[in-house]
Amino acid sequence: MSHFSIAGMQLSLPCGDNLTTIGEEITKTKKRFPWVDMIVLSELLTYGPEKKYAEKLPSKAEIFYCELAKKLDIWLIPGSDYEIDGDDIFNTTSVINNQGVVIQRYRKIYPFCPYETGVSCGQDFVVFDVPQGRIGVAICYDLWFPEVARSLVCLGAEVLIYPTLTGTIDRNVELSIAEATAAMNQCYVIAVNGLGDYGNGKSIIVAPDGSVIHQAGINKEIFPVEIDFALVRRNRERGLHGLGQPLKSFRDNSISFAFATKNNRKSSELSKLGELKIPKS
């Protein structure tokens, strides 16, 4: 079988310890949709976007989610939490399998600078396997950087999952980016946003052809969907409607993208943009 079911949970929760409420919501979702294989939460849902809740891993929250995943026999991507590692704080998501084991941890590569201050950049891309195929994970603002998605896809990702927390007026731009990311990489894109003081919802699931499977509104919503990994492979092998095969073209082209190296990113042209800081009036 090539099908794998994923439910996104778009919730409104305050800053503070939300573990009990989240556990109840996950349990209710699994009871209502027993066929769901994985549940995905929004970014920083457990405690909210305050770094005073940062913990070393494995944390109380991560252990809680592991026990819940094992109890319910379900995969979990429980949004993200701030992680302390030495002198650094990372925005980190855990990937927990249905035996309750953390199989991967991903640190957000692109914190939302200059607003998400005091958060270090992750350095590693993360993909993981479920029985039906391979999934890549990134977080929120990572979506704005096509290099992240393409790197995950080159590692074999067929589904890209983005726990997200944004309440800004550019949400509709992000939805367009999600659609384009799915089409350009011939994969599913799932971006689960939060609600309340920091999130404006509009979570989205996009098919490998760039079409929107579901877009949530601005209220609490649980949205399960069945992913078909065979559809991803067919689109990549044959092209959408037998047309473009961009991943094969990317693979076979001889060009090297010099701009992607660290030195070239600091070119004179990009340096003209000035310092990365919050604009003044």
Listing of model-derived features with the role each one plays in the protein:
Residues 1-8:
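Extreme N-terminal starter segment of soluble prokaryotic enzymes
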Residues 10-12, 107, 193:
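Residue-level recognition of beta-strand->loop/alpha-helix junctions
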Residues 63, 84-158, 168-176, 180, ...:
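Active-site catalytic loop in hydrolytic enzyme cores
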Residues 57-76, 144-223:
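CN hydrolase (nitrilase-like) catalytic-core segments centered on the catalytic cysteine
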Residues 5, 34-35, 134, 156:
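Short loop/turn motifs at secondary-structure junctions
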Residues 18-20, 29, 71, 121-122, ...:
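Eukaryotic scaffold repeat domains enriched in small/polar residues
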Residues 127-129, 194-281:
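C-terminal beta-strand edge segments of enzyme domains
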Residues 13-99, 105, 167-183, 187:
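Cys-nucleophile CN-hydrolase/nitrilase-fold catalytic domain and related Cys-dependent amidase chemistry
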